[in-house]
């Protein structure tokens, strides 16, 4: 019965225009080295047996028939003899050693037995392979020219090889012009790996380009171990490499968008606004793109001017977002001493009155701009700081007195409008609205807030004492305000100056998400395209009722969990035992050490406040 034949695909894959390093460690072989040489267009290229060898796993080898195994042995021996006909040193591959061992183990009787068995039926289709003689294999090829004629010399003994450094192919240490390499032992470094394609960052490419400009492309390729074609390509894109990030490795992606004319006109609009000094936001670019799309009769379903389109368009035209660096609050030099004093006052009040979590709160006033100025602008990549103009209406703002409790509840917003009267209109429910000539919080408005917000808060019990944490605004610490709070059975705690960013819950967890939400709603309102224009063509500010609705939506979006965590982070509602540990850690940082925390009476606390 004839055995089933499986097709054997012996194909070699040619990889062009990419550098690869072979990664297969070769075991210590015999000291005698073969000579292999390939001379291609005047340059030396190493030829290795692994480049023309095919390997099978044990499972794959068992599937092959005897005919296929014989064919495989014959092809591998022919490839080996072909590489031997060249002149470049490499040890004998392990595969050839194993094949020679298998050949010796198979005696001639086995082949005669196969021939005799098949002769009983008919002539045998399987013939013993005609192994070429290794000694005569080189006679099939022309004798190569010796290395001396090229000005190169290969040492006969491996001990004659010079030292060469790690990271370079071994053939660069064999006397090739342009290389100055060294190594401890070339036999230990005699290894190649077939790995992934190499990629280079922009910093490396610029270094190669600068070297090529001072010498030539060929010398740069040899110096850095890259292809000369890569050097030519990198020199063509030198401006892009200079403007790109030093770690960028490729410039991929489509060069033109689906609506190239829209992209081009938006880019022209950005340059025009840059020349005028006006700030450009991505929202403004999206609005301009929608306007251009309407002029070009592009359907709304086909082009939406989304944020993703804006990002890709900016990438295609080398635009980036420039952020305004916020000015951080400078902490005082006596930060540790103030922290210890503040922690002692809070601990003393909590131990003296044992406040309920729902009776501890924090309140503060914050300005909210009607027309929120953008903190970013679109500009060319790599540009220096740019000056931009503002619409001049960023000073039109309202003041909001906000309050939160330690159990996560939010008090109704207390809005102070600028003016002598409250303009007519429809305002959202759930907030208190007042007016002031300058839009500021005053002593009278603070007392009004205590009456309409703090006294009426949910869960307020006359017999239960409360604690309210305020900042150092002078309108908070007046005698009339203190008397009003005392009548409401509430203790006042003043945060030390310069520490509100660290100790005030509203600064820690509320203000940033609140302002971000208001800006997002304002941007969506602009993108809707239904804003009114003034006689001069400028966009009018949003209606007051709409803006207050944005503030209410942003206030309701603050989660109760974040407020609870903010009180714990500021060490207001944490466990008293944990507070002692924190106070010990703070006092240990003082220059003179610190004393254990002592319980302070209420009278001394009132004097300190």
UniProtKB/Swiss-Prot annotation:
Which residue numbers delimit the KRAB domain?
Answer: 47-118
Q: Is Lipid biosynthesis one of the keywords? A: no
**Disordered, as annotated region:** 1-28, 100-127, 588-609
Q: Which Pfam families match?
A: BrkDBD, DDE_1, HTH_Tnp_Tc5, KRAB
Q: Which GO terms describe its cellular component?
A: nucleoplasm; nucleus
Instruction: Give the highest taxon in the source lineage.
Output: Eukaryota
Gene Ontology MF, one: DNA binding
Q: Give me the stretches of Polar residues compositional bias.
A: 108-119
Q: Which UniProt keywords apply?
A: Coiled coil, Developmental protein, DNA-binding, Isopeptide bond, Nucleus, Ubl conjugation
Q: Where is the DDE-1 domain?
A: 353-567
Record domain HTH CENPB-type: where:
250-323
Which InterPro entries does the entry mention? aKRAB (IPR003655), Brinker_DNA-bd (IPR018586), CenT-Element_Derived (IPR050863), DDE_SF_endonuclease_dom (IPR004875), Homeodomain-like_sf (IPR009057), HTH_CenpB_DNA-bd_dom (IPR006600), KRAB (IPR001909), KRAB_dom_sf (IPR036051)
Find the cross-link Glycyl lysine isopeptide (Lys-Gly) (interchain with G-Cter in SUMO2).
13, 384
Identify the PROSITE patterns for this entry: HTH_CENPB (PS51253), KRAB (PS50805)
| Primary subcellular site in the record, as a coarse category | nucleus
CDD domains named among the record's database cross-references: KRAB_A-box
The identity of this protein, by name, is Pogo transposable element with KRAB domain
Report the source organism.
Answer: Homo sapiens (Human)
């Amino acid at each position: 019965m004839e055995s089933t034949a499986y097709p054997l695909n012996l194909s070699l894959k040619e990889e062009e225009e990419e550098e690869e390093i072979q990664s297969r460690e070769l075991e210590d072989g015999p000291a005698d080295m073969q000579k292999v040489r390939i001379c291609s267009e005047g340059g030396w290229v190493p030829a290795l047996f692994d480049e023309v060898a095919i390997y099978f796993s044990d499972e794959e080898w068992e599937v092959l028939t005897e005919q296929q195994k014989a064919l495989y042995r014959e092809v591998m021996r022919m490839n080996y003899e072909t590489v031997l006909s060249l002149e470049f040193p490499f040890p004998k591959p392990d595969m050839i050693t194993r094949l020679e061992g298998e050949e010796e183990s198979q005696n001639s009787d086995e082949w005669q037995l196969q021939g005799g068995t098949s002769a009983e039926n008919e002539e045998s289709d399987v013939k013993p392979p005609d192994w070429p003689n290794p000694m005569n294999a080189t006679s099939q090829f022309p004798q190569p020219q010796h290395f001396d004629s090229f000005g190169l010399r290969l040492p006969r003994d491996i001990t004659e090889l010079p030292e060469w450094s790690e990271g370079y192919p071994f053939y660069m240490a064999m006397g090739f012009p342009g290389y100055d390499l060294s190594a401890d032992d070339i036999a230990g470094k005699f290894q190649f790996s077939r790995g992934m394609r190499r990629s280079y960052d922009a910093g490396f490419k610029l270094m190669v380009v600068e070297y090529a400009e001072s010498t030539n492309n060929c010398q740069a390729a040899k110096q850095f171990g890259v292809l000369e074609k890569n050097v030519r390509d990198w020199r063509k894109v030198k401006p892009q490499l200079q403007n790109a990030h030093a770690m960028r490795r490729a410039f991929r992606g489509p060069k033109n968008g689906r609506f190239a004319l829209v992209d081009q006109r938006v880019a022209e609009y950005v340059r025009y606004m840059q020349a005028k000094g006006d700030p450009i936001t991505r929202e403004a670019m999206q609005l301009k793109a929608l306007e251009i799309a309407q002029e070009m009769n592009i359907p709304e379903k086909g082009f939406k001017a989304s944020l993703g389109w804006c990002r890709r368009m900016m990438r295609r035209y080398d635009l980036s977002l420039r952020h305004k660096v916020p000015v951080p609050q400078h902490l005082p030099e006596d930060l540790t001493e103030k922290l210890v004093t503040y922690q002692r006052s809070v601990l003393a009040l909590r131990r003296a009155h044992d406040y309920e979590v729902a009776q501890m709160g924090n309140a503060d006033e914050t300005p909210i701009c009607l027309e929120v100025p953008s903190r970013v602008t679109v500009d060319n990549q790599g540009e220096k700081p740019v000056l931009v103009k503002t619409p001049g209406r960023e000073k039109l703002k309202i003041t909001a007195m906000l309050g939160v409790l330690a159990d996560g509840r939010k008090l109704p917003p207390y809005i102070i409008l600028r003016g002598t009267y409250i303009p007519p209109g429809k305002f959202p429910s759930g907030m208190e609205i007042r007016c002031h000539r300058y839009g500021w919080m005053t002593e009278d408005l603070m007392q009004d807030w205590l009456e309409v917000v703090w006294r009426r808060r949910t869960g307020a019990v006359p017999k239960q004492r409360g604690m309210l944490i305020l900042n150092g605004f002078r309108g908070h610490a007046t005698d009339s305000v203190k008397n009003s709070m005392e009548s409401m059975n509430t203790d006042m705690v003043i945060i030390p100056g310069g520490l509100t960013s660290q100790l005030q819950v509203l600064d820690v967890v509320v203000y940033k998400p609140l302002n971000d939400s208001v800006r997002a709603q304002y941007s969506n309102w602009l993108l809707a395209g239904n804003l009114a224009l003034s006689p001069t063509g400028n966009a009018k500010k949003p209606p007051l009722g709409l803006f207050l609705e944005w503030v209410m939506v942003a206030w309701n979006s603050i989660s109760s969990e974040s407020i609870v965590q903010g009180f714990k982070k500021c060490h207001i509602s944490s466990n008293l035992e944990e507070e002692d540990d924190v106070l010990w850690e703070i006092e240990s940082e003082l220059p003179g050490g610190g004393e254990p925390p002592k319980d302070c009476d209420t009278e001394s606390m009132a004097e300190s406040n």
